[in-house]
């Protein structure tokens, strides 16, 4: 059986408080998912956080593991972007492959150790891993369709489009190149600021490949 801890309940309440009271997202547009056997997580969301039962979904996918080693049930928080982003399926809900429900927060309660034979043993020292998507939260707060249109990234797209003499959102192929350059420019900046330089091995080779791909998309836009 899945057993949560007092600490995991606190993290759920803090996540909910941050989303609804600090950045003031509409509670009616927030949905949560839990592992089917994690009744305590379900009760915490419903009884302690006030999440309506219709906004809580039990999903088999809500169990985090990467092969052998520490693992456990998780809860995810989704933001409903509206039916215009959906698939028109009347049963559409968090976990659907369409774009209606955007995952913005994940809380993992690591309480098991997966053994080589596939069995699960309780961990002596349990822990909680929680995180939110900064760019996804920004897209929700700013009413943007994608992360690329937030004020974190779009200025790079605008500058690149101006340099190339193109307009964003007019040609799908052009948009792909603009997004690749914006994304790669940020990655390159982070790597170089961490002391990485282009080379033939290790992190330097990764940086080199990222630079090459950004340059290739720049040439596709006509930038020499």
Where are these regions (language model features)?
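Composition- and surface-driven signal marking solvent-exposed, interaction-prone regions
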Residues: 90, 153, 201-204, 221-224
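Single conserved hydrophobic/aromatic residue that forms the stacking wall/gate
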Residues: 1-7, 11
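Alpha-helical cores of eukaryotic small-GTPase signaling modules
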Residues: 155-169, 173-175
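Active-site cavity-forming subdomains of large catalytic enzyme subunits
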Residues: 9-134, 138-151, 170, 179-180, ...
């Amino acid at each position: 059986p899945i057993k949560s801890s007092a600490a995991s309940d606190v993290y759920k309440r803090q996540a909910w408080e941050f989303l609804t009271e600090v950045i003031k997202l509409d509670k009616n547009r927030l949905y949560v998912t839990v592992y089917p056997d994690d009744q305590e997580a379900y009760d915490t969301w419903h009884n302690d956080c006030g999440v309506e039962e219709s906004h809580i979904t039990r999903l088999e996918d809500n169990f985090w593991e990467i092969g052998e080693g520490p693992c456990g049930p998780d809860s995810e928080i989704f933001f409903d972007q509206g039916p215009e982003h959906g698939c028109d399926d009347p049963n559409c809900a968090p976990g659907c492959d369409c774009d209606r429900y955007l995952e913005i927060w994940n809380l993992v309660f690591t309480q098991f150790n997966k053994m080589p034979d596939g069995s699960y043993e309780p961990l002596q020292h349990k822990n909680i891993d929680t995180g939110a998507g900064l760019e996804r939260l920004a897209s929700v707060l700013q009413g943007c369709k994608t992360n690329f249109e937030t004020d974190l990234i779009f200025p790079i797209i605008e500058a690149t489009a101006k340099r190339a003499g193109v307009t964003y959102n007019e040609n799908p192929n052009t948009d792909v190149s603009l997004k690749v350059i914006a994304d790669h420019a940020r990655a390159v900046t982070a790597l170089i600021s961490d002391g990485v330089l282009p080379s033939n091995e290790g992190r330097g080779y990764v940086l080199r490949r990222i630079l090459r791909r950004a340059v290739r998309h720049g040439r596709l836009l006509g930038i020499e």
